Amino acid sequence: MVLVTSVRDYINRMLQDISGMKVLILDSETVSNVSIVYSQSELLQKEVFLVEMIDSISVSKESMSHLKAVYFIRPTSDNIQKLRYQLANPRFGEYHLFFSNLLKDTQIHILADSDEQEVVQQVQEYYADFVSGDPYHFTLNMASNHLYMIPAVVDPSGLQRFSDRVVDGIAAVFLALKRRPVIRYQRTSDTAKRIAHETAKLMYQHESALFDFRRTESSPLLLVIDRRDDPVTPLLNQWTYQAMVHELIGLQDNKVDLKSIGSLPKDQQVEVVLSSEQDAFFKSNMYENFGDIGMNIKRMVDDFQQVAKSNQNIQTVEDMARFVDNYPEYKKMQGNVSKHVTLVTEMSKLVEARKLMTVSQTEQDLACNGGQGAAYEAVTDLLNNESVSDIDRLRLVMLYALRYEKENPVQLMQLFNKLASRSPKYKPGLVQFLLKQAGVEKRTGDLFGNRDLLNIARNMARGLKGVENVYTQHQPLLFQTMESITRGRLRDVDYPFVGDHFQQGRPQEVVIFMVGGTTYEESRSVALQNATNSGVRFILGGTAVLNSKRFLKDLEEAQRISRSGSHMV
């Protein structure tokens, strides 16, 4: 149940069965699916000499009949129209058409009618309609991620497109895994309910035969949940490597754009890859905390210096031959050392400049510990601190408001006013909009561990034992959800089943899909949970991979649309 492998296998089959020189044609979504699992050099090995976007191919008129065109695109109306035009005026010798999801019969007829010169050799469906950067984590990279917060009456067609794209993505995941799941959803989320029901309709009615795979001992589970049940996790600063890079610099499809770091010399302002599949150091350190990363990078630098020293000591022809043989590996090692040193150095500067250790300690207290009075004092002090950035002030007030929504409204209003005066760039009412979206009345789970007696006892025990690292003591709500599933205790009343497909006992395979987006802290929780060998394997997916900046951007956009929509309705 590893999605990266499924996607790689699809692309392997696509490219190796077609001999000769090829051009690979992608769209704005499949380019991410391919680039995250396949490197440029691997494409060259498969005789792919050109990678083009379907949009630019439409514009060009140059004939390239010596090349075979391999299309890998989503089966959207827009793509079908572009393909129709390209088949009517073929530039390539052969056309091999691969679609990342289900084609409609009408689309197949359109393509057949357009292929008057009979250049199409094959039409296939390869179900890779998702981006899988880590073994147990996938995303749909949805630009319109804010739509899950908009009431259906405000933008019905936008929400329908959003739901359709999510259903397509979930369907592709299960077709890639060759499974048909039992489906459950979070009761308090209309969007999760809608997606769960539409997915069930596709799998059990419209495409029942396609999803009729060999029965396994227990049916896998698809659980559709809503980001708003845990608004705390995407608001926190992060202190483990992968999550921290995404929070402070940004990680898109396993790539970090160093151009966003203005202080670097021009020759270092490049895009670097951070992939557990391609980088052994990153694979073994992606979930480690920041303090340990520094020590591990120092060890890597020491190892590299030893290799560099031995390369300087070239005295014989044999030494020279050995150096030439080892040079590609040496250059790769040099690039890797440089990449990780640059990232950690830049993050250290940001931590210092934004006083993130002080800010984060208060964040963790707000997320994990009680004490409203002390929390109010700490947040007030940080709002007054000139070194604290606007985004950090906003996040602190949001975390405080989520935690103490029902306590001391006067102090809460004082924090709102102070935030408005200290950080006027944020629209008034954004914190209140968050509470309206994800406040205590809207949530299903025990987010702060203070509703359920068992959770209260567990938090007290953790407090008494002490916490190994004050900056990483927070656990996402997802951790509790996985624990409930593993123990067979996920409540039907909170997470109802769709239709009459129920589950006896606990499932062995679970896909949790989070409408509104996941975080790298949550994907870390999934990886650690899978490493415990509990007998249940989890995959986490979502509409986007969030950091606090993206979560707040989505929130602002939803607030803007809700305001204009409320005037219209």
From Swiss-Prot:
Belongs to the STXBP/unc-18/SEC1 family. The keyword Aminoacyl-tRNA synthetase does not apply. One of its GO terms (cellular component) is trans-Golgi network. Involved in the protein transport to the vacuole, probably at the level of vesicle fusion at the trans-Golgi network (TGN) and not in transport from the TGN to the prevacuolar compartment, by promoting the recycling of vacuolar sorting receptors back to the TGN. Involved in early endosomal vesicle trafficking, particularly at the trans-Golgi-network/early endosome (TGN/EE) thus residing in early endocytic route. Highly expressed in roots, lower expression in leaves, stems and flowers. The gene is VPS45. Gene3D superfamilies: 1.25.40.60, 3.40.50.1910, 3.40.50.2060, Syntaxin Binding Protein 1, Chain A, domain 2. This is Vacuolar protein sorting-associated protein 45 homolog. GO terms for biological process: auxin-activated signaling pathway; intracellular protein transport; pollen germination; positive regulation of cell growth; regulation of auxin polar transport; regulation of root morphogenesis; regulation of vesicle fusion; vesicle-mediated transport. It comes from the Eukaryota. It is found in: Golgi apparatus, trans-Golgi network membrane; Early endosome. InterPro entries: Sec-1-like_dom1, Sec-1-like_dom3a, Sec1-like, Sec1-like_dom2, Sec1-like_sf. Keywords: Auxin signaling pathway, Endosome, Golgi apparatus, Membrane, Protein transport, Transport. Disruption phenotype: Male gametophytic lethal and stunted growth associated with defects in vacuole formation leading to reduced cell expansion and autophagy-related defects in nutrient turnover. Blocked transport of vacuolar cargo proteins with C-terminal vacuolar sorting determinants. Pfam families: Sec1. PANTHER family: VESICLE PROTEIN SORTING-ASSOCIATED (PTHR11679). Interacts with both SYP41 or SYP42 and VTI12, but in different domains of the trans-Golgi network. Does not interact on the pervacuolar compartment with VTI11, SYP21 or SYP22, or on the cis-Golgi with SYP31. Interacts at the trans-Golgi network (TGN) with the SYP41/SYP61/VTI12 SNARE complex. It is a peripheral membrane protein.
